[in-house]
A protein has these predicted regions:
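Terminal targeting/low-complexity segments that flank the catalytic cores of oxidoreductases
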Residues: 1-152, 300-371
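Extended alpha-helical coiled-coil scaffold domains characteristic of the BAR superfamily
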Residues: 150-153, 184, 233-259, 280-286, ...
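Long, hydrophobic, well-ordered secondary-structure blocks that form the structural core
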Residues: 136-216
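Hydrophobic packing residues in well-ordered alpha-helices of helical domains and bundles
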Residues: 146, 177, 241, 272-276, ...
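Alpha-helical bundle segments that constitute or directly flank the non-heme di-iron/ferroxidase center
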Residues: 56, 61-63, 136-168, 234-262
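Acidic/His metal-coordination segments adjacent to aromatic residues that form catalytic metal sites
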Residues: 124-145, 205-245, 265, 304-308
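Inter-helical turn/loop segments and adjacent helix faces that build the functional surface
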Residues: 162-176, 194-203, 230-238, 257-278, ...
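Alpha-helical scaffold segments in carbohydrate-active enzymes
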Residues: 176-197, 250, 278-293, 321-324
Length: 371
């Protein structure tokens, strides 16, 4: 009888044993070591909003957390988002918060609501044959002038804000300008679709007339020149200031609010004001963040005087240009059959709006506004 076999011995795996020491970063005391919450920024209020959580510090900055410096850049220029891309200065660009608190969800929600409302209005207008009540003079006015304004909105969205929203030093600013860009492009698209709708629904409406008006009509060449010069502005803050503060107040609000929305109903048109009103609502939101940003810069403890001087120079450059563009639009005030407000009154209201904005920003009013 053979002896029982010895059981096979198990081979033990060799791996290093963990050693716990107090010599590493875990043993250090930080200001937030005892905190039960985590925040890498100081919120504007007691608690951080969702807007701040998803927007703040998304864009890197060597002054905050990016201790190794810029990790990418352009082949023919500096890395990242240099502060030198604008003549304005700030002790802390990260102080800016968009008063509209726009982030991904609100962008989709707000624009979807606007498009839905406009589409419902257009559908209702077709069902009610609302366009048949338009006067011939008003039909021609919309055909030529509202169509021409579409080019201004598209140019500002695609060539001013599309470029500017990549240039500011913080994501909070760039995000606000990106939403501004979306507003302009959506409104331009709304006007284009409205033009197609009228071409199909309104007999005698020439849906292609706006091209010749924008390119050749002397009345619109001042606006066109102003828009094209805005697209060439290299300083992102100058482009934003000259567009949202100067051009929009003196030309945009003048045309949209003080002309189209004032006289459309008297000419049998209740549809166009609802469309143009959505664009005016967008601008009011965009003016809100612009005011907040430039007020922060003009009241900067260290650079406020410098910034007011720079902005004053931009006013001297852009206000005469926009005033000239506005005055060249004067003949279209006499085109509709029913007119309720003279150009001088509309223009004075537009200039009053600009004066109010400049007062909020602690900026001196240019002499041209009093002429």
């Amino acid at each position: 009888m053979t002896a029982p076999a010895e059981p096979a011995t198990k081979s033990e795996r060799s791996f290093p044993k963990p050693e716990f020491t107090d010599a590493e970063a875990g043993a250090l005391e930080f200001p937030s070591s005892g905190s039960r919450s985590y925040n890498y920024f100081t919120p504007a209020k007691l608690r951080a909003t969702t807007y701040e959580d998803v927007t703040f510090d998304v864009q890197p900055d060597p002054a905050r957390h990016l201790s190794q410096g810029w990790i990418y850049g352009f082949g023919d220029g500096p890395g990242g988002y240099p502060h030198e891309w604008t003549a304005l200065k700030s002790t802390d660009w990260h102080k800016f918060r968009d008063p509209n608190e726009e982030w991904e969800q609100t962008i989709y929600r707000n624009n979807a609501n606007a498009v839905r409302q406009i589409q419902q209005n257009l559908d209702n207008a077709k069902l009610a044959d609302a366009y048949n009540s338009w006067t011939p003079a008003w039909t021609k006015f919309v055909e030529r002038n509202l169509g021409a304004w579409m080019h201004a909105e598209h140019g500002l969205g695609l060539h001013v804000f599309m470029a500017a929203q990549r240039s500011a030093p913080t994501n909070m600013i760039n995000n606000a300008m990106a939403v501004n860009c979306a507003h302009k492009l959506r409104f331009a698209q709304d006007l284009a679709l409205y033009n197609l709708d009228l071409s199909e629904s309104l007999s005698g409406f020439d849906g292609s007339a706006h091209r010749a008006v924008w390119q050749d009509d002397a009345v619109w060449q001042g606006v066109r020149r102003n828009v094209e010069l805005l697209t060439a502005a290299g300083d992102w803050a100058e482009a934003l200031f000259a567009t949202n503060v100067v051009f929009e107040q003196l030309v945009g609000v003048l045309f949209r609010s003080h002309l189209v929305m004032q006289i459309a109903a008297r000419n049998g048109d209740y549809v166009t004001p609802s469309l143009v009103g959505s664009g005016e609502h967008d601008y009011n939101r965009d003016l809100g963040y612009s005011r907040a940003l430039f007020a922060l810069l003009t009241r900067d403890e260290e650079h406020g005087a410098h910034n007011r001087e720079v902005l004053g120079g931009w006013l001297a450059k852009w206000v005469p240009l926009s005033i000239a563009a506005a005055r060249e639009l004067q003949p279209i005030w006499s085109q509709p059959q029913e007119r309720t407000i003279p150009f001088a009154e509309s223009f004075e209201a537009a200039k009053s709006g600009l004066r109010s904005v400049l007062a909020d920003l602690d900026l001196d009013q240019p002499e041209e506004l009093n002429r």
